[in-house]
Each structure stands twice: as C-alpha cells, then as structure tokens.
A protein has these predicted regions:
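Charge-rich, low-complexity intrinsically disordered linkers/tails
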Residues: 1-111, 177, 181-182, 187-219
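Arginine residue identity/basic-tract feature
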Residues: 77, 90, 118, 130-132, ...
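Generic structural motif
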Residues: 42-44, 127-129, 155
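Hydrophobic side chains in beta-strands
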Residues: 39, 124, 152-153
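Short connector loops at helix/strand junctions that flank enzyme active sites
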Residues: 32, 117-119, 145
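Acidic, metal/cofactor-coordinating or nucleic-acid-engaging core segments within structured domains
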Residues: 108-140
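Metal-dependent nuclease catalytic regions and adjoining charged, substrate-binding loops involved
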Residues: 132-211
Length: 219
C-alpha cells in the first residue's frame, strides 16, 4: 500500500518578521527581526515544557533594570507601519517555524551578549508573529505555546538555543514568562589560515546542529 511521504522540511533564506506590542506606559514597540535563513516544517515543534512548568514561571522574578529604562538603546520614530508579518503563509505546506539561523558578519565586532540577545530577539519576534497569525492580532496568551529553535554563529563558533513563547503580555512583571534554553557557543576549530590550514577541529558544534535539525522531524 502506497503511503505519501510528508513534505520535507524547507529552508528559506533572508527572511524577516515584524511584531507590534503596546506596553502599559503607552510605548509602542516595533520588533523587526532579520534572519539569514529559516527551516520550516509541516508540523509545529512540540512544547519544551509541561503546562505545570509553564505555570511555575509566574514565580520567577525578573531582574530590576532601575535606574536604566528599557527603551534606553531603542530608536524613537514617529513614522512607522502598523503591519505585523510572519513570512510564511498559512497555505504553505511547511509553515511552522522550526529553526532560525542567525549569523554575525566578521567585518563588525559583536560582544557575546549581543550575539545571544539578537538570537533571542529573533526567536521572540518570529514566535510571537506566528502566534498572532494563528490565533488573531489581539492574542495575548496563545492557547498553545509556540516553540522555535535557533542557531547563532560567526566565523569561528556556533551557539544554540530553544525558545518557548508562552505569553505576549509584557506589560507587567508578574504572570507567566517566556522561556529560553541556551547551549554554547562552541568553537568550530582552534585556528584556520592559508599557511597551516584548519587546526583543532571540534565536532561538538555539528553534533548539536544535527540534533536541532532532527528534533521533531520525521525520519
């Protein structure tokens, strides 16, 4: 008996997602995340945590940034579009976000914290925009968490993270929180140049990369 195979995961390059959130103080935040590529799948990734574990995040205290304000490094604009975007249409066979790939050009210096923050922001923006696409523009708490994975890399290293969107309510510090798990970054090699070639190759990064790719995908 012939059984049609499920569509294979699809890799699309150079995508961005847009999310708008209005906070309790009246500030409208426009999140725009650009990624180098996105692996999408027919079925969504399963939640990384149980409902009980998600509920327990309400007891987690967030760091106090005072006297710094959360908009300190944000650019203020008076002209913007009120359009949210998740780049994959709901009619697509592979519409669910699986793994985002974020690279950091070597011609600009990035601190490790900046690389990680950029990856987390990309996960939040893509997952939240997907939740709004699925459940409506007014969605605050999606009925099901939206899970997404991400790799972030430069010339020499790879880092990995898993992100679970539980809420879009950023107005208060109480209530359930979103969750992120970070692994790495891991160096791919010790040195690489034209004279000696590649030295000190480490397979760990590729092992992690393969694990993320295979997670939730049919064999």
């Amino acid at each position: 008996m012939y059984q049609p195979a499920a569509p294979s995961p699809h890799l699309t390059a150079d995508l961005f997602s847009v999310l708008l959130l209005c906070l309790a103080d009246g500030n409208l935040l426009v999140f725009t995340a650009h990624v180098d590529s996105v692996l999408t799948s027919k079925e969504p990734l399963g939640a990384f945590c149980s409902p009980e574990e998600v509920k327990a995040t309400a007891d987690t205290e967030l760091p106090d940034l005072y006297p710094a304000k959360y908009t300190l490094e944000l650019e203020s604009r008076n002209i913007y579009k009120m359009d949210e975007l998740y780049p994959m249409p709901r009619t697509s066979g592979n519409q669910h976000p699986h793994t985002l790939h974020v690279t950091h050009p070597y011609d600009y210096f990035w601190f490790p914290q900046q690389k990680l923050a950029r990856a987390i922001l990309a996960c939040f923006t893509f997952a939240a925009a997907r939740a709004r696409q699925l459940y409506g523009a007014d969605t605050v708490t999606p009925p099901e968490p939206v899970a997404v994975q991400c790799t972030f890399s430069d010339v020499k290293s790879f880092g990995f993270l898993a992100y679970q969107l539980n809420t879009l309510d950023l107005r208060e510090d109480n209530g359930i929180k979103n969750q992120v798990w970070v692994d790495g970054p891991y160096d791919l090699y010790e040195s690489c140049n034209h004279e000696t070639g590649l030295e000190g190759f480490s397979p760990i990064a590729f092992q992690r990369f393969l694990a993320l790719y295979k997670n939730g995908l049919a064999a």
